[in-house]
């Protein structure tokens, strides 16, 4: 069996100046159920409303530094400064979050290969903050994975139906890639 440590180790063990005084083994980076999506102009790919959409639509993370509002928003807390930061995504212009972890830029392929760019969604808005997968009972881990998937589907649904962008429109053209 391989020995391992999770979370934040105490300063007395590591000598790191920013380490906490006491060990915090449950203090782990959130996990994310990523998904791929593309944008096909003129088509409507709106998914069915996820079961937990109402919860995730209203969810405000209880973290320090504080998150600036709802998780499903184009605003997030910068991880370094903690200051509210605006995010944008414009699949037509290929800017902002749309290019972050983009899988395929249709401009780099023979015309017609892809109807639109394909982007992998691993954004601050779908980081699951309500529990860990490590060192928890299997049933608890499965519940966290289910809820993380609900969060990711809720983010997609929010973008398709409620999210406003600079040009004041939602994007039902965003398609979930199976």
Where are the model-predicted features located?
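Flavin (FAD/FMN)-binding glycine-rich loop and adjacent Rossmann-like elements that form
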Residues: 1-178
């Amino acid at each position: 069996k391989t020995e391992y440590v999770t979370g934040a180790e105490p300063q007395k063990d590591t000598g790191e100046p920013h380490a906490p005084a006491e060990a915090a083994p449950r203090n782990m980076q959130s996990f994310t159920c990523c998904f791929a999506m593309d944008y096909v102009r003129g088509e409507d790919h709106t998914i069915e409303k996820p079961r937990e959409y109402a919860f995730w639509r209203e969810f405000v993370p209880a973290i320090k530094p504080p998150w600036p509002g709802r998780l499903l928003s184009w605003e997030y807390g910068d991880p370094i400064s903690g200051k509210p930061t605006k995010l944008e995504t414009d699949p037509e212009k290929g800017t902002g979050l749309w290019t972050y972890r983009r899988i395929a830029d249709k401009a780099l392929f023979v015309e017609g290969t892809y109807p639109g760019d394909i982007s992998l969604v691993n954004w601050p808005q779908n980081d699951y903050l309500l529990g860990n997968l490590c060192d928890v009972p299997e049933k608890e881990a499965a519940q966290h994975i289910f809820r993380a998937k609900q969060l990711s589907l809720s983010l997609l649904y929010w973008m398709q139906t409620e999210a406003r962008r600079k040009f004041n429109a939602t994007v039902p053209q965003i398609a979930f890639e199976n």
